[in-house]
Amino acid sequence: MEKKLVYTGKTKDVFALENGNYLLKFKDDCTGKDGVFDPGENSVGLTIDGVGDVNLRMSIYFFEKVNAAGIRTHFVNANLEDTTMEVLPAKVFGQGLEVICRHKAVGSFIRRYGQYIESGADLPAYVETTFKNDALGDPLVTKDALAALGVMTEEQYDSMKDMTQKITQIIADDLKEKGMVLYDIKFEYGYDADGNVMLIDEIASGNMRVYKDGEYIDPMTLSKLFFA
């Protein structure tokens, strides 16, 4: 099947396929700074041999679990030999949203609200949404603001929140079986031609904060432990 490059990303390239779907090519490039891997950085900082492969493997694993639970995603199939994943077409909300689900109070949450809660305290699958905007530091945005700005309807937000909490629990339960604890995780969503919300992008170690025996596991170590 012929493919046409339509977008070159930091960690993935996107190709249009003849059948109307898209092909994501996972790369070994990682976001980071000064040669140090950091999923929170906004530019490619280094190349790690095999990282594209492990990110694709984890994405396949969890997308199949999420699809089996009846939750809509863009995942169609994947080819590990050429590190690609075929996905359904989807439009992003606005210029892109990131949705975080938190089971523990850490990271930017504790920096914002540390005077009200202890670091590491339990949270009830707390969901927050940010605009993808590097220049503004990915600002938080509320449900009311998203509706008022015409980015998404209240119904789409409610669907996205419900999906986020269910997907997060699926991943947390799986990690728990492996002796690990999910603290928080980041997702991206889009919608199809009928306005149905769907999970897009990837489900990889660089998008989640995971601990084992009280110690943080960096994304590359997490990937190795996950498939050990």
Give short role names for the model-derived ranges.
Residues 21, 94-96, 179-182, 194-197:
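Coil-to-beta-strand transition motifs
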Residues 39-54, 139-163:
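Short histidine-centered catalytic/ligand-binding loop motif
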Residues 74-83, 175-191:
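A short glycine-rich, hydrophobically flanked beta-strand micro-motif that places a catalytic Asp/Glu
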Residues 111, 119, 202-228:
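C-terminal helix-cap and adjacent tail motif
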Residues 128-138:
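Active-site cradle of extracellular carbohydrate-active enzymes
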Residues 152-183:
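A long amphipathic alpha-helix within ATP-dependent nucleotide-binding catalytic cores
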